[in-house]
Amino acid sequence: MAKQANSLAHTKWMCKYHIVFTPKYRRKIIYNQYRESIRDIIKQLCAYKGVEILEGHLMEDHVHMLVSIPPKYSVSSFMGYLKGKSSLMIFDKHANLKYKFGNRHFWSEGYYVSTVGVNEATIRKYIQEQEKNDILQDKLSVKEYEDPFKGQG
């Protein structure tokens, strides 16, 4: 993708961020119908604010997004909006989740953010391959529960 600056009335801008955030208690809840619903809600809220999702991936227990946020919004105000509104919309659509989370707080406090410059391709690849890497790490971590002193036979 060619690097193109976006435009507002008197501004040319190219503000890209890699953002990661998690459900409350880092619960592994983003799957099946929840995954599809959360994806649609996040897309809808981003479109409403004029935030372009360049790359994104929903894992069971966290969300990776590469986004382009207009400079009229701070990252913190956008994330407050995204997490706050999406929580309300998720609980409206899936009322049974209130028993797992309570208080209509779906997301944990805070988030990770980094700016994206020349390493955009690297970050895109990282987001795309995140699930594969997590699966490989899970397979490696299974061995730690095996007793090394027991024989094979």
Enumerate the predicted regions with their spans.
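Basic nucleic-acid-binding interfaces
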Residues: 1-153
